[in-house]
């Protein structure tokens, strides 16, 4: 096996955090590869040695020990499954690979990145790196590697390098790497041009934009065997504020509210040392004054997408809890129909089409509806699902029903 250098940050089409999963043929399920752990997985454009055409590589590296867990070259005959909103797996050269994502938004972004790479392979496109990184084509600009990675703190911009790597294995383009611990000096750690300067007459409270890992309660029923591995430690990117000389002092008192004490210095005596404790201005900043500006966007805790507070209304978030939708499913006994379809018409991966789907391209379309007819006799409430669902869709279009985005924090 030839040892390959990891892809550069600028060569990635998409990059997310996920847990690399491997197929267990004995049990028919998926297990975390090499003991699990959160990894940084991305789709990068590479140039094989001695070939004028570019290939695309799925590269996964565990965060805690920098161990390469996944290296998979994409091919045109790749088969991709979206088993759940946070678990996707694919098949290439009779090898199966899987990823458990932290959020549905990360999963959708990775899916779009893979489809973009497959389209380029099919069309034989020689699109440059700047065209591939078009955020308008792929969306979810928070996970695409068009700028410095979120774990770094750099203000430098580098030109996308053209690299040369060894050709893939002749027996197949996909493999799980069992290399030992790889030391990558400088990888994802860029030098900082300037240190944190001491502010003058300005107080800023930086928001920690690290993604908070949350599990949708409705997804927990589907995730068995790998949902616990989505939990990941959150590392703060900012230094401890107690170690930095700041102009803000928090008064220690028994009051439940924080008093922000700003030292008042006389402009006429800047060169004279003076006890600042004798002249202090006690102010209480307005609540949520900076969170509700016109046109400000926030991240939803349910779907992890960015949304505008001014345009947020009912029906905007499909992942948000909705009491009306839950009531319709309970009244129409759709849980009973889903249970029967899962046991009778699911594939080897446990996937099945929605009970009332009208997609005629499904090979089991007629069989599914023939099964629903006797089920509606046993549970007559199922006959009410379609008219109730139609009324619900009208309510969503009018803004009367549906879930709303909720800002994180």
Curated annotation (Swiss-Prot):
The keyword Cytoplasm belongs to this UniProt entry's keyword annotation: yes
Subcellular location: Cell membrane; Cytoplasmic vesicle, Secretory vesicle membrane; Cytoplasm
Family annotation (Gene3D superfamilies): Pleckstrin-homology domain (PH domain)/Phosphotyrosine-binding domain (PTB)
Residues annotated as domain KBD: 199-253
Chain intervals with Low complexity compositional bias: 146-155
Keywords noted in UniProt: Cell membrane, Cytoplasm, Cytoplasmic vesicle, Membrane
Entries under SUPFAM superfamilies matching the protein: PH domain-like
UniProt main location, coarse: membrane
Protein name per Swiss-Prot or TrEMBL: Sprouty-related, EVH1 domain-containing protein 2
Native species: Xenopus tropicalis (Western clawed frog)
């Amino acid at each position: 096996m030839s040892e390959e250098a990891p892809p550069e940050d600028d060569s990635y089409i998409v990059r997310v955090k996920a847990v690399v999963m491997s197929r267990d043929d004995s049990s028919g399920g998926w297990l975390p590869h090499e003991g699990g752990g959160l990894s940084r997985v991305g789709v990068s454009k590479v140039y094989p040695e001695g070939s004028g055409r570019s290939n695309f590589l799925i590269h996964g590296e565990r965060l805690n020990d920098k161990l390469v867990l996944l290296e998979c070259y994409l091919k045109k005959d790749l088969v991709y499954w979206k088993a759940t909103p946070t678990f996707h797996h694919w098949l290439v050269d009779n090898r199966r690979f899987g990823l458990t994502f932290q959020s549905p938004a990360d999963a959708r972004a990775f899916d779009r990145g893979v489809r973009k790479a497959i389209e380029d392979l099919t069309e034989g496109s020689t699109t440059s790196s700047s065209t591939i990184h078009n955020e308008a084509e792929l969306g979810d600009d928070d996970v695409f590697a068009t700028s410095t990675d979120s774990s770094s703190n750099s203000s430098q911009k580098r030109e996308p390098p053209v690299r040369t790597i060894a050709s893939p294995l002749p027996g197949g383009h996909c493999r799980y790497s069992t290399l030992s611990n790889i030391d990558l000096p400088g990888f994802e750690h860029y030098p900082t041009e300037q240190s944190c300067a001491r502010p003058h007459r300005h107080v800023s409270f930086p928001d920690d934009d690290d993604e908070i890992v949350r599990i949708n309660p409705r997804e927990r029923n589907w995730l068995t065997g790998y949902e616990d591995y989505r939990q990941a430690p959150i590392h703060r990117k900012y230094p401890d504020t107690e170690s930095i000389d700041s102009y803000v002092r928090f008064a220690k008192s028994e009051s439940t509210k924080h008093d922000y004490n700003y030292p008042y210095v006389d402009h006429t005596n800047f060169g004279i040392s003076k006890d600042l404790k004798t002249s202090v201005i006690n102010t209480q900043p307005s609540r949520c004054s900076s969170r509700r500006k016109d046109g400000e966007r926030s991240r939803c805790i349910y779907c992890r997408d960015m949304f505008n507070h001014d345009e947020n209304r009912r029906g905007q978030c499909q992942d948000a809890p909705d009491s009306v939708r839950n009531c319709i499913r309970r009244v129409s006994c759709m849980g009973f129909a889903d249970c029967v379809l899962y046991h009778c018409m699911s594939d080897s991966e446990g996937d099945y089409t929605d009970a009332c789907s009208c997609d005629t391209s499904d090979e089991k379309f007629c069989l599914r509806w023939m099964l629903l007819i006797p089920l509606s006799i046993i549970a007559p409430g199922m006959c009410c699902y379609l008219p109730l669902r139609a009324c619900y869709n009208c309510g969503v279009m009018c803004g009367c029903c549906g879930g709303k985005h909720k800002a994180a924090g």
